[in-house]
Regions:
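Juxta-kinase regulatory segment immediately upstream of eukaryotic protein kinase catalytic domains
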Residues: 2-55
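A recurrent flexible, glycine/aromatic-enriched loop bordering the glycosyltransferase active site
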Residues: 51, 57-59, 219-224
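ATP-binding pocket architecture of kinase catalytic cores
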Residues: 54-181
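Short, low-complexity Ser/Thr-rich regulatory SLiMs
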Residues: 106-109, 240-244
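Residues immediately flanking
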Residues: 120, 231-233, 260
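An alpha-helical support segment within catalytic cores of ATP-dependent transferases
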Residues: 138, 145, 151-231, 241-253
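Active-site Asp-x-Gly
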Residues: 227-228, 241-284
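Conserved protein-kinase catalytic-loop position immediately C-terminal to the HRD catalytic Asp
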Residues: 236-237
Length: 284
């Protein structure tokens, strides 16, 4: 259960609401500054965010990310779970995986839009950068991604399959119109998770297909270790910054993983399978 994770000045109004039984602190739009460690941060207003001309997200995305005041990347849309901000806060405190610094997150009560105000990452996403990379550079970046996944998988287990603070999954595999908690979790074990995935598929697929799939699931999807998982490792969610060259003259990079909306504890195969599907089986 997160507490008052944002330390604010006395003029900032605070409002605690409930989202899936977890208390989040909403910093309302009237907040002008926040204090993080010894840093006083002047936040952009909603008006400044909505007027931002530099759009960082893809044109067809329902969620918008903009560059504001040189310092901030702001993600906003209806339906973004505030837990995405909590995930990044959690990872910054509990792992060595590089993630954007989160300054604040809130819901605008007038529009019901979620806003996550983060640091702006200087660099390019891997989707944009990939065509210009040399084979040796691709190998270096692949190793960095692998190392990040290994670090994620070393995060302590909470004793369930689900997201931070014993909350349900946000992956579309578990989506139902009524947000059925029996389908979205959290789950006690992989067997329960498998049953609920098949139950979810029953809503859209033919029974013959489910029967065939049941046999495959029973014979393969068991005894996997639960590990912390990003869940959406598309190339566009891997930011790459060039660093100073190594002593041997070879190029050096660092990667920052973004878009932590569906992260949580999943069976160990989940990261690979989701990344493969997201990349549409492209060799690179």
């Amino acid at each position: 259960m997160p507490g008052n994770i944002y330390q604010c000045n006395e003029h900032i109004k605070r409002l605690c609401l409930q989202e899936h039984h977890t208390t989040f602190l909403f910093i309302l739009p009237l907040a002008k500054t926040i204090k993080m460690s010894n840093e006083i941060v002047n936040l952009p207003t909603i008006a400044e965010i909505e007027a931002a001309a530099e759009v960082l997200s893809m044109p067809d995305n329902s969620t918008k990310v903009v560059w504001v005041k040189e310092k901030f990347a702001v993600k906003f849309s209806n339906g973004i779970p505030l837990s995405e901000a909590e995930n990044m806060k959690f990872l910054a405190a509990n792992s060595k995986v590089l993630v954007p610094k989160v300054y604040t997150a809130f819901i605008d009560l007038e529009t019901n839009q979620t806003f996550i105000i983060m640091e702006y990452i200087r660099g390019d996403n891997l989707q944009k950068l990939l065509p210009s990379l040399m084979p040796t550079e691709k190998v270096i970046i692949c190793k960095l991604v692998k190392d990040a996944i290994i670090k994620l998988q070393k995060i302590s287990l909470p004793g369930y399959l689900g997201t931070l603070n014993h909350q349900p999954y946000h992956d579309s595999v578990f989506w139902t119109k009524d947000n059925n908690p029996l389908i979205s979790g959290p789950f006690a074990n992989q067997k329960e998770m498998n049953c609920r995935i098949l139950e979810r598929l029953h809503q859209t697929e033919l029974s013959q297909y489910i029967q065939l799939l049941q046999k495959t699931v029973d014979s393969t999807l068991h005894n996997h270790h639960p590990v912390f998982t990003h869940g959406d490792l598309q190339l566009k969610n891997i930011m790459v910054e060039k660093a100073e060259s190594r002593n041997d003259g070879s190029p050096a990079f660092k990667i920052i993983l973004i878009d932590w909306e569906i992260a949580g504890w999943y069976p160990e195969y989940w990261e690979f399978c989701n990344a493969t599907i997201s990349c549409r089986f492209k060799p690179n």
